Curated annotation (Swiss-Prot):
It is found in: Cell membrane. The chain crosses the membrane at residues 34-54, 79-99. This is Cytochrome bo(3) ubiquinol oxidase subunit 2. It comes from Buchnera aphidicola subsp. Acyrthosiphon pisum (strain APS) (Acyrthosiphon pisum symbiotic bacterium). The gene is cyoA. Cytochrome bo(3) ubiquinol terminal oxidase is the component of the aerobic respiratory chain of E.coli that predominates when cells are grown at high aeration. Has proton pump activity across the membrane in addition to electron transfer, pumping 2 protons/electron. Residues 1-15 form the signal peptide. GO terms for molecular function: copper ion binding; cytochrome bo3 ubiquinol oxidase activity; cytochrome-c oxidase activity; oxidoreductase activity, acting on diphenols and related substances as donors, oxygen as acceptor. Keywords: Cell membrane, Electron transport, Lipoprotein, Membrane, Oxidoreductase, Palmitate, Respiratory chain, Signal, Transmembrane, Transmembrane helix, Transport.
């Protein structure tokens, strides 16, 4: 009995540390509320259905000879009203809830705060994350830091296939697309270390494509970390260096870059833009044409 009790306790408490259900940011808390409300509303359908399934199975079983047999019964307005009205009300409520929360939690929507936001550019590589702090001219791989209660504005792109950026404890997932910029606004309300992941399959190293998001209490602690990164001997000031760190690699360790090439994020993004391909194609045509004329 004691063993069974321990197993049940372990089973029911197993989800308590799930980041989705253990929110530490305003956006994540709102999303948790949406999940909880939707779950409770679904129970208004699921519980009666399970109850009626068991009840009708017992009441109208073949061995129960005490029930009245009605072979010509085919209609009940009471049942029709119940089975249509209740689902319509619940679905309508959930539709309104989803619509309102979709606008309320729009990833591009700025978070209102008295504190100035921190800007972080995130680039999905194979299979690691590059983070650029444009206001501090530094970059990191697989680690970010920010003070609590200070909005974070992410610009996200990919230098490889489509990916997805997600810090479950803080809020929304957003896709990372090559040649595109997606935006995400988050904020941390508690001090802690949170796991960030890639939530979209991007190759055999995808499962190890994780990073650490650290929220600190004081802005001075964050600035000390910035100075630590600035003291690094490694610089990310050429595209050649970027090409080296872009080489596919699993289990890539945390790395700091004391300076970053100007406008690097846009240069990465524009590698995959239509305009870039058109310019490359036109340039190739000009080179071919020039070589052809020289041969003539």
């Amino acid at each position: 009995m004691k063993t069974l009790s321990l197993i049940l306790i372990f089973f029911f408490l197993n989800g308590c540390n799930n980041p989705l259900l253990n929110s530490h940011g305003t956006i994540a808390t709102e999303e948790y509320s949406l999940i909880l409300i939707s779950f409770i509303m679904m129970l208004f359908i699921i519980i009666p259905v399970i109850f009626m399934t068991i009840y009708f199975s017992l009441k109208y079983r073949s061995t129960n000879v005490n029930q009245i047999y009605k072979p010509n019964w085919c209609d009940s307005k009471k049942i029709e009203i119940v089975v249509w009205t209740i689902p319509i009300i619940i679905v309508s409520f959930l539709a309104f809830l989803s619509w309102s929360y979709t606008h309320k939690l729009d990833p591009k929507k700025s978070i209102v705060s008295l504190n100035n936001p921190i800007k972080i550019d995130a680039v999905a590589l194979d299979w690691k994350w590059l983070f650029i702090y444009p206001d501090y001219n530094i970059a990191t791989i697989n680690e970010i830091m920010f003070p609590v209660n200070r909005p974070i504005v992410f610009r996200i792109t990919s230098n490889s296939v489509m990916n997805a950026f997600f810090i479950p404890s803080l809020g929304s997932q957003i896709y990372a697309m090559p040649g595109m910029t997606t935006k995400l606004n988050l904020i941390a309300n508690d001090v802690g270390k949170y796991k960030g992941i890639s939530s979209n399959y991007s190759g055999h190293g995808f499962s190890n494509m994780k990073f650490t998001a650290i929220s600190v209490l004081k802005n001075s602690t964050f600035l000390d970390w910035v100075k630590k990164v600035q003291a690094s001997s490694i610089k990310l000031n050429t595209m050649k260096t970027f090409d080296i760190i872009s080489i596919p690699n699993e289990n890539y360790s945390i790395e700091y870059f004391s300076s970053v090439k100007k406008n690097l994020f846009n240069k990465i993004k524009n590698q995959y833009s239509i305009k870039h391909f058109i310019l490359d194609e036109n340039l190739s045509h000009e080179i071919v044409k020039k070589n052809f004329n020289m041969e003539k």
